[in-house]
Structure formats: C-alpha cells, structure tokens
C-alpha cells in the first residue's frame, strides 16, 4: 500500500534515533589514512592506529545497527511520525548513495504510442543492447522487450517485460554519474490491463508516452487512472514528433484538461513532421540535437534557432507560471518578478512531480532516434528513488495496523511477488524488495499461508534473458526460481508479521466454453489452464456443472484468443471453443417482505428453520449486503452466520438466468428455531429458499455489461463507422476530428460488440482501430431479458430430462 501523498511528513524527534553516521564515515577515512601511513613515522604507530581504526569501525557498525533498530521500531509504532526525511537522514552512507542512484520505472501508454520502440532506444543508448531492432521489423528479430513469438508477429506487447540498465548522466560541469534503472515495458491494449496494474503496483515512477498526433487517447486515460490508484509520479514524453500532423502542445493541453493534472512542456521542438531536428531545453535554454548513425551522440548548442525563439520564450513563461501554482518557492520568485535559476527550476519540478502535483512534458521521436536521451535525464532528475517513496504494510500481529516499510538492507526482509511466469527452469516469480536483503539460499515465509520456502536462485531479468546474482538489496526488483506462490503474495524472513495489500484486479466480462479437440490432450490442457490462471489474475477457469462445460473468462476477445493460441503453440493442444458468453448479472426490482418456514419432520433428524425479514435494492449496482436486526435472540448467532452463508450462496447464482446477483440487500429481523431439528444447514437452506422466492416476486432485472468504446479511423470513413455503431445500438457521446483522422467515443453493450473488429476492418479498409473497456452494468432491453430467461428455462428443462 502506498501512502496517498508523497510530500514529506513533518519531522519529529523520535526516541532512540541517532543522527546520520555520515560524520563517522568521514572520520573512518581519516583513521584509515593515518593507519596506512603510520608505519612510515614509527614502528609502533602502525599497529596502534590500526587498533584505533578497527575499534572505530566497530563503533560505526554498532551505531548503524542501533539506528536501524530505532527506525524499524518507529516505523511500526508511529508510522505517521516517521518522515521520509528521517529515513533518508539515517541511511547508512553507502546505502544512501546506492538508493539515490536507483530508479524503478515503467513505460505505459495507449496502444501504438511507441512504448516498446522507446524502450528499445533506452536499452541501446544505455549500452544494454548492441543494435536496435524494430517492432515487426524487416530483420525478423523484433524489439528486445517483445520476447514472445506472438508479440513479434502481432506487433503488440502482451506481457510486461522487465529489464535493467545503467545510464551515465552528464552534468553541465562535465561530471558523469552512473544511475541504475529497473525498467518495465507494459502492454497498451486494454485486454492486458492487469500487466500495467501489477507493474505500477511496485514501481516508484513512470514515463507516460503520448502520440504527438493523437494526444491523450482512451488507454492513456486508463493508465492515468492506474497511476493515480498507486500514487505513481510520472513524467510525460510526446513521441512521434516526426509524424504528419504532429502537434505536441495539443497533447500538453489535453494532459491538463482531460487528465486533470497540471502539466507544462520542458522542451520545445525544433521543427516538426519530416523537419523535426531536435529540441530546445527550456530549463537550460540550450538546443539539443542527435548525431550519429543511431542518434547516439547528443550535441548541445547555446544558440536557439530564430524560428522557435518566440515559442521558447512563451513556453518557458508558461512553465514558470504552472510551477508557481504548485510550488511555493517558485510562487515567491514569481510574485517578486525574479527569474528562477536552472537549479531552482529543476528542484521545483522534482518536488512537484514526486508530490503528484505536476508532470513535466518531454518531446521527441523514438523511431527517428531523436531526443530520447534528454527524457532519460528527466527520469533521473524528476522521478523518485526508492528511499523517497512511502510504502506501507499491515502488521497482522497488531490487528493489521499500518506500518511503514524502511528501505534499509539491515532491516528484516519484506518483499512482494507481483508477477509469475513459466520458464524452462520452472516458475519464475518477480519480487520487489521493499525492506531488507533477499539472499540466495535464504528461507522466506509466505505471509498468506505462513509456508516456509527456500530461495534456490535469484536472477535479474533482461526480457527473456537472465543474470544470476547472490543477493538483492532494498528497493530492487528481481526474479526467483522455485518459490511456489500466487501473484500478490507478501514474503518476509519470518521476523515480522507484515503483509502488503495486493493490486486491483478487474472482473472478467466475457467467457467462452472450451475443450481440447482430442481427449488425449486433456492432461496438457489442464496444465495450461492451471499455469495461465497462476500467471494472470484476470484469466479465470470454471466448470459449469449444468452444461458440463469448461469456461474461460477474461477481459475481451483478444485476451482469450491469445491464450487459446498460446495453448496451441506452447502445449500443442488444439481447442474447440463455443460462442462468446457475456457475464450478465441479476438484480432485485423493489422491496419485498418474506416470512419463510422450512419444516421437514418425518421421523428421525428433521429440519426446522423460520426466517422473517425483507429484501430491497442497495441503491447502487454494487456488492450485496446482508444484515441481521434480531431483537430478543429468536435466532442464535451461529444460525445467523448460516443465514449469511445461505445469502452469499444464493447471490452466486441468481434465480432469473443463473448469473451472479448485484445490488441486493437482505435483512433478517425475526425467526424461530426448534430445540432438536434446527441446524446451521436448515437455516442456510431456509435463507436460500426465502431469497429465491422474494427475488422472483420483486420484479427483478437482467443486467448487461456496458463498454466504453473509442474508435479511431481516417476521416473519409466517419459515416461508415457511425453507421456501424448505430446498428449496435451504441450511444455516441463525443467525436473529435483531427488533421486526417477522427475519433468517436461511445457506450455500447458488450453483447452488441461481438464481431465488431471484423466489420470495422472491412468498413475502413483495415485502417480503423478501436479499444473497449468495461464501464458499468445496465438493465438489459426487455426483449433480450425475455430471450435470456427462455433460454435458461429451456436449458434447465433439458437437464432434468437427462
């Protein structure tokens, strides 16, 4: 769980917390120097100084250990009182340097905005790869981060891929500093949104990429929502500046208006489209150009081209004004009409970005190898290191009280498994280490089941390649083999009873019946299903006893198609699938009172349970609610627990069409028991029967999932696209017309969208694209409801005939 605000908490004096051991460290160097030269001055001086050095070194280690222990105690007992400043101040100096040079970032955006292309340049410029390969490139190699054959064939990212690299940042004084970056490239398609979700859950910052032509798109809004959910600071990069119709300032404006986050350009492009040459840095007021066969050399010039001078002055003024709205120091300078220095601007942008108040906007073209390196400098300058981000856990030993995680290597280990993958060597588990050190061969405990497991191997991942390491420190991301767990599990070294909140997992909206073509493939079919469920929390497998079918459920048609194709390729299992099935829901119509008696007394143990109360809508189509308002103890506590269980079971399969129930409240306020014949089973069954009867009397409704649809296509096809949507009874909410394309925003039932992609391709000569995301549930049309009920009743009747 990440703290809602990354702004520093007020620093309070904490008992037992010593000052930073930085001074001890500097004295340590002095003692070491004296010890090394003492033998030149006196035969006995060397051993004497060495003795002092050893004693002082022990004091330093003891001081660091005492400080770490005090910080750990403060993190548990008074997390609000322990500021990030105090945590950083009391870091071991070597650890402070390591963490300050570390960034954990993700790259996220709408589909086809250039995420993977941009990541490929980052890896090349940092020296991680020796050559650039394009997504769907002609060399049949493909981008490094698209390691699956399916990804390279389709030209889309399906799974998030992790890598690491080192970036050497050059200062204005020519001094070079090396930074370590853990980077995760995420998919852009909405069907694979869980990959973005779990990446952002463990990252400290992100680069949000936008298309210079399209600006903020539908999946950009989804990614923004996910970043806000986990309080992830971001910088923005307007890509594809070399494309026809590129308008980066439209993208900046849309970040402000559509995403509702203050944003300002920190660069101005020199030219655009096929005349895009480079950028002007608005903070340093210098021009930046890329040279070399792959743009690997950055050339900095003091001269700003005449053609962009007026735009540069205007955009710098807008940058300062926007910062003045979100940062007190710049606001003071602005009111005093004092021009801020480069250092003041950088510090303000960093504070505002980490505080989730602002996003700086960079510009470039990854495909044209232009202005990617300045964006990397922005990652270092403006995104937080692990010690600057507040992460919270829950202490199960203290009624799940919040505790702060401290990124010290000397603390007890706490880590989160955020992604599972099957490899040739077994299950690969990705872990973010929040506190302590994870060592090869160490025993760790799964907080979910208290199971102890040994860590046989630790690796750093570079897409589908790996590099073995012996240990990983706080703030790092790694992968381990041989650890059986589920996505979202917390691991500790056994000293602490901490658990971390898992990521948000959306409910599936579409299902298919599936079975292997040949019965001999059943074993591999079952293996594949088990593996895919472990890896992807949004992929669900269930068995329908009535139809005797296996059902797979997911986020969309593409999502399920990918898994069916993976089963064929990776497990050599060809499958037969049924038509798509919509995840309908049922809900109560109006308030209904009930007084139900279950009585079976025919010799021997009988059944007796009476439940009295009412059922009504909750007001919102959300979770169901059960309440008891018993006065006088007419139903005992254990029987009321059985009533609640019966209610929950009844909600799993509604009486109308056999789908889950939403937005229904059940209240039991009276009842009766029998001395010998009442049991928990009796009250569970009585509640289910009362539920079914009252539900059917309430004028219930079938609910169908409504989807947010965004269609983008060339302008000449606008009429055809609108016609396609109208045929599906879609509600068109808005349209946007660009230079050569248009975008339609609409709501439509999922049932009406089956086969839409095929019809869209035909209507737009293959040039149209669309995204679809679950929005809400809505009452189905009366005719559809009637058809669904008849179909369900027929299936029930056919089943009883068997």
From Swiss-Prot:
Keyword annotations for this protein, in alphabetical order, are: Elongation factor, GTP-binding, Mitochondrion, Nucleotide-binding, Protein biosynthesis, Transit peptide
Localization, UniProt: Mitochondrion
Matches recorded under SUPFAM superfamilies: EF-G C-terminal domain-like, P-loop containing nucleoside triphosphate hydrolases, Ribosomal protein S5 domain 2-like, Translation proteins
Molecular function (GO) terms for this protein are: GTP binding; GTPase activity; translation elongation factor activity
**UniProt-annotated binding residues for GTP:** 109-116, 185-189, 239-242
Where does the UniProt entry say this protein principally localizes? mitochondrion
Tell me which SMART domains the record gives: EFG_C, EFG_IV
Any idea which residues the transit peptide spans? 1-24
User: What Pfam families does the record tag this protein with?
Assistant: EFG_C, EFG_III, EFG_IV, GTP_EFTU, GTP_EFTU_D2
Has the keyword Repeat been applied to this entry? no
The tr-type G domain covers: 100-387
Q: In which pathway does it act?
A: Protein biosynthesis; polypeptide chain elongation
- GO cellular component terms attached to this protein's record: mitochondrion
List the InterPro entries hit by this protein, alphabetically: EFG_II, EFG_III, EFG_III/V, EFG_IV, EFG_V-like, EFTu-like_2, G_TR_CS, P-loop_NTPase
The record's Gene Ontology biological-process terms are: mitochondrial translational elongation
Question: Nucleotide-binding: is it a keyword of this entry?
Answer: yes
Question: What does this protein do, in the record's words?
Answer: Mitochondrial GTPase that catalyzes the GTP-dependent ribosomal translocation step during translation elongation. During this step, the ribosome changes from the pre-translocational (PRE) to the post-translocational (POST) state as the newly formed A-site-bound peptidyl-tRNA and P-site-bound deacylated tRNA move to the P and E sites, respectively. Catalyzes the coordinated movement of the two tRNA molecules, the mRNA and conformational changes in the ribosome.
Supply the HAMAP family for this chain. EF_G_EF_2_B
Return the similarity comment.
Answer: Belongs to the TRAFAC class translation factor GTPase superfamily. Classic translation factor GTPase family. EF-G/EF-2 subfamily.
The record's annotation in NCBIfam families points to: EF-G, PRK12740.1-5, small_GTP
Q: Which PANTHER family has this protein been placed in?
A: ELONGATION FACTOR G, MITOCHONDRIAL
Protein name as annotated: Elongation factor G, mitochondrial
Q: Which gene encodes it?
A: mef1
